[in-house]
Amino acid sequence: MNPVIGLDIAKGESKGQVFLQKGKPHGKSFDIQHTKEGLSQLQEILLSVEEMAGASPTVIFESTGHYHTPISQFLEEHQFVYILVNPLIAHQAKKSSLRKVKTDTLDAYRLCELFYKEEFEPHKQRGLKLLELRNLTRQHDAITNLLIQTKLQFHAILDQVFPEFRGVFGDLYSKVSIHVLSEFPTAESVLASSETDLANRIAARCPSRSTRWAADKANKLMAAAERNPFRAPRLQSHLLSLEMYIKILLQYQEHLSALEKQIDALAMDLEEYLIIQSIPGIGGKIAATIIAEIGEIDRFNHPKKLVAFAGVDPSVFSSGKFTATINRISKRGSSRLRHSLYLAVLCSLRKSGSKRLKAFYDRKRQEGKPHKVGIIACTNKLLHWIYVLLQRKEPFLDMA
């Protein structure tokens, strides 16, 4: 017998169905809660099916973000084999029936049927370090997106309170710039202070700079206050919003700095991190994201599978005598990996980047390929290089 248990996972609970072999469901469907008692119930079901069928059952369920984490972690701890199905494949299987019926019980039933139709590979447990790195890099991306949104809102408020402040410091979001703005949020507060006092405040915020630099910034700040179209905002709510956004910006910057330190410390212990960084143009953050999203390279037995995992494989459409000649990439893989590879290619095509990749890009352009097509071709080529480098555990050798 080849037993399988299909689980339709939802938030905090799952609906299950047991098959002892193809076409032979066993018993009625069951419910389990994602609690200690519920997982113990699942273990009892697994052991009873194993005793009945004479073989350990495989558990199959759809990838549901973080909802399936309690189930997958429990199965790994108790060394049960499970298959994590791509949601797209599961969705296509659910649509195979002519009847428009959708229930959790039926979904679990169809997952069992899908197990016998397709040849799935058991899910391979990833190393803890790579999982930690993946979570850290994803958290970094999430906070970066929040920081970008906050900057946009901060800009809108600054335009209504102190628009001329933008040109005072080279980087509006540097710590010294943000702290000075928090102390002097309006043109009125700047003009109420002397230029010497401003210079001393700026110098205290940035002790690594010279007093001459602080005096120059104080002069620019005073000039900006004089040029500002209004001394103080008409609405006090704008001033409160500005103070709030300043605090949020500083908090996000602090969180990102802490995450970057943890990512660097964790990545330095991984051999793959140094191997990918040997490719000219790829820095620490991009290298960490790439290896975190790829995971163990042994999961892929061919570079084309890695290309498909990144979603940069071409989509193909052919019907009858028609075959499409303009094919877009599938975009069905890891979007974070795809974005990191895109940035890696752009960096590698610079003067200080990879000469081999630049030569490959130039060749594609000479063939008449548009810029974006050349970039995707370079992404595909870069993935093949990464696959070989990680398999052989060798650094990248560029053209002389």
Where are these regions (language model features)?
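A detector of single, family-specific signature residues
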Residues: M1-A400
